[in-house]
């Protein structure tokens, strides 16, 4: 059988692509080296932020607004356990923060619902938060967080119900191109398609070693908290920048545990074996202490944590482009630790590619040629 589309990597983007392409009537094969959702990539750990006023640059705003529409649609499949939780997101940092300046600019350009607070206003609204006098907060009322593993599980189930073929626990070992399309090699045999999407995440260089993607080991952890830090108490998700420039992110507490991670830093790695479990690097359990001690002093000890990986591009912007010399293969990689919130729209973009539809978005900033 020759498929219309083969998806290599069915985690965040691949699961979405499989669903949207199958729903569009294509004959699709989803593949993954493991059984998604799983612990081997960048999507585990239950939750991921979704921010609209984007500190990484306004080029992302049209994408994230479409992503939010798709998340809302997907959430209707799980109304008892919603995939998107509109907790709000407070972005904290020094008044001269470049990140916060980008957030404010994005909000102004796109007329987003963002409220600016000074230090006293932040601490009056959320007494659990402490910030210096020179800090400001930009509160995104309509943002929140996503249930990442539940989203992937839902997409995969919906795709399967729509007739999508799924080949999991079966790594792709090679990709071949010819005039007739794309062939992938696996331990289970060879499969052919008219087009392919490569969204293999951290280990995409195992298949395409020439790509400018660097895996980085990252950790996040859950710390002892109480009901004051919960969604029920209107405590928001957050990003926070310390005076030294370190960037943190976190979520409202659930079951008396608050999850937090450090966005910058981490350990450069070159193989899956180097991504050692949480606590095998001495600093893992204390990485969030500088933020907790200064901004959330009421949070208690580290309860548990997990390691994941970022697939960083050189400029930490996404790579969304066809494979050089092979216009029938789309790359979606280099998501650099801020990609999950876009998984829905990136999956839709992949499905449009498979149907020979022109994207509704300007993807020029994400081309591979910027690194040449």
UniProtKB/Swiss-Prot annotation:
Q: Which UniProt keywords apply?
A: FAD, Flavoprotein, Oxidoreductase
What are the protein's GO molecular function terms?
A: flavin adenine dinucleotide binding; N-methyl-L-amino-acid oxidase activity; sarcosine oxidase activity
This entry carries the following GO cellular component terms, namely: cytosol
Note the InterPro entries from the entry. FAD-dep_OxRdtase, FAD/NAD-bd_sf, Me_Trp_Oxase_MTOX, MTOX
Taxonomic lineage of this organism?
Answer: Bacteria, Pseudomonadati, Pseudomonadota, Gammaproteobacteria, Enterobacterales
Q: Which residues carry this modification: S-8alpha-FAD cysteine?
A: 308
Cofactor binding remark: Binds 1 FAD per subunit.
Q: Which cofactor does it need?
A: FAD
Annotated protein name in UniProt: N-methyl-L-tryptophan oxidase
Annotated catalysed reactions: N(alpha)-methyl-L-tryptophan + O2 + H2O = L-tryptophan + formaldehyde + H2O2
Q: Which residues bind FAD?
A: 4-34
The record's similarity note reads:
Belongs to the MSOX/MTOX family. MTOX subfamily.
Q: Name one Pfam family in it.
A: DAO
Query: What's the stated role of this polypeptide?
Result: Catalyzes the oxidative demethylation of N-methyl-L-tryptophan.
**Which EC number(s) does UniProt give?**
1.5.3.-
The record's subunit annotation is: Monomer.
State the species of origin: Escherichia coli O6:H1 (strain CFT073 / ATCC 700928 / UPEC)
């Amino acid at each position: 059988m020759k498929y219309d589309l083969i998806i290599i990597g069915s985690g965040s983007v691949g699961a979405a692509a499989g669903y949207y392409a199958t729903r569009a009537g294509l004959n699709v094969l989803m593949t993954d080296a493991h059984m998604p959702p799983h612990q081997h990539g960048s999507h585990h750990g239950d939750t991921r932020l979704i921010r609209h006023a984007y500190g990484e640059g306004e080029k992302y705003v049209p994408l994230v607004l479409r992503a939010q529409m798709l998340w809302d649609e997907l959430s209707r499949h799980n109304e008892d356990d919603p995939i998107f939780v509109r907790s709000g997101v407070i972005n904290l940092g020094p008044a001269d923060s470049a990140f916060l300046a980008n957030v404010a600019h994005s909000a102004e350009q796109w007329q987003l619902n963002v409220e600016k607070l000074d230090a006293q206003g932040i601490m009056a609204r959320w007494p659990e938060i402490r910030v210096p006098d020179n800090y400001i907060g930009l509160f995104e009322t309509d943002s929140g967080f996503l249930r990442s593993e539940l989203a992937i599980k839902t997409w995969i189930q919906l795709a399967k119900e729509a007739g999508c073929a799924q080949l999991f626990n079966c790594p792709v070992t090679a990709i071949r191109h010819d005039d007739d399309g794309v062939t992938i090699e696996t331990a289970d045999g060879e499969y052919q398609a008219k087009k392919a999407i490569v969204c293999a995440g951290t280990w995409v260089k195992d298949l395409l070693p020439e790509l400018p993607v660097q895996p980085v080991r990252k950790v996040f952890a859950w710390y002892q908290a109480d009901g004051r830090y919960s969604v029920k108490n209107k405590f928001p998700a957050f990003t926070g920048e310390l005076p030294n420039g370190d960037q943190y992110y976190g979520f409202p507490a659930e079951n008396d545990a608050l999850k937090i991670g450090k966005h910058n830093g981490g350990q450069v790695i070159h193989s899956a074996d180097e991504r050692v479990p949480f606590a095998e690097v001495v600093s893992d359990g204390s990485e969030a202490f500088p933020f907790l001690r200064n901004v959330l002093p009421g949070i208690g000890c580290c309860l548990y944590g997990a390691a994941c990986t970022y697939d960083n591009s050189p400029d930490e912007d996404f790579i969304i482009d066809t494979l050089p010399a092979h216009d029938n293969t789309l790359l979606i990689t280099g998501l650099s630790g801020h990609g999950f919130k876009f998984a829905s729209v990136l999956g839709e973009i992949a499905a449009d590619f498979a149907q020979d539809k022109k994207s509704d978005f300007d993807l020029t900033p994400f081309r591979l040629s910027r690194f040449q």
